[in-house]
């Protein structure tokens, strides 16, 4: 049954192919051509009978030839299978070639990727080396920065130590000079006392025995300035360095009056003080510029001051003087507070003394200056006073007038600064740069307590001379400077 069905299927297939192509169609391949020739030659022949298989003859209508066609069912099936196998082989070959090409492409990619991977590994290695080198350089830079900071700190410490040593040396030199002055004053005092004793002895010999010797005025200066009595007063009220240094210098001016003990009209004698200030001494008849004993109101503090009675209109109390550079003004806070120097030469009266003087009334300030060519100028301020030490002696100034230019108002309202007390508005200590004590701002338009340089123009790392910026500038050290105060009843602020 199955062979018969297969035979029908193949015959139908051949009939369809033959109807589609026709007898005039081109024959492709040798096997198809021989098959068609066999059909045409034997179309009227019967196939040989075989004892195993049965054959059938179908008559398929043709366009030109009519009749039955006998087809061998074996041979077309074999040819078709061969064609199918060839197509499959070709497909397999093509697939193999395609896969071979893909494999070659993959091998090339693998080779390229392998090179890239090796390059990436090399770059990573170089990157690690570079990072390590950068880290080393960074650490070296940090060590260098730290070393420089340490060196800068050590240098700053050395500079501070040098400054302190210099200040100590200058203080020792100043103390040595003060001791020399003390010795000279003591020698002068001993000589003067010897002369006074001799004069008294001579006077006693001239006075008759029956006539009582007239008594000297009760407030005579020798009684005030004798060392025992004066030392007791000073020990009670003050230990001012200036007072202890200069207490022996007031006696010589009074020596000429000592022989006149026989003059009886005591009502004409001048009061010997102490006075409230130099103006009161002038009003009491003391018109000579000299050292006077002053006791401000509201305090028991006695102080010796230089009174300038010649500068019009007189009555000026000198609080600072610079004239020859004999005194070092680069001092600490306590020294500036108590005062230092020589009252008849370069000296600073003392912040505490200035405070008590200026707070007993309205005072004005006069600053006289002279350069090295002899030119003299002045600056006057209508009011001048200091706050107490709790306010670090803050400066209070009034209105300016004069011909020197205003270089002090910029310091108004500022606290006093020394090398060991920094109260200025600058980030550092202005006293270290200006080499003095002053009411520094940031830092100074005037520096009258600076270094006294000879000749005017000076060379220094900082502007540390005795200068008034509006008069000759900050790089010019003035020859003479005097700061003095006087009561001003018509004070206006």
Swiss-Prot record:
Keywords: Coiled coil, Disulfide bond, Glycoprotein, Secreted, Signal. It comes from the Eukaryota. SUPFAM superfamilies: Fibrinogen C-terminal domain-like. Disulfide bonds join 278-307, 430-443. Residues 77-115, 152-202 form a coiled coil. One of its GO terms (biological process) is blood coagulation. Residues 269-489 form the Fibrinogen C-terminal domain. SMART domains: FBG. GO terms for cellular component: extracellular space. It is found in: Secreted. Widely expressed in heart, tongue, lung and skeletal muscle. Also found in lower levels in kidney, epididymis and testis. The keyword Hydrolase does not apply. Glycans are attached at residues 164, 192. Pfam families: Fibrinogen_C. Residues 1-19 form the signal peptide. CDD domains: FReD. Induces sprouting in endothelial cells through an autocrine and paracrine action. NCBIfam families: GGGWT_bact. This is Angiopoietin-related protein 2. The lineage of its organism: Eukaryota, Metazoa, Chordata, Craniata, Vertebrata. The gene is Angptl2.
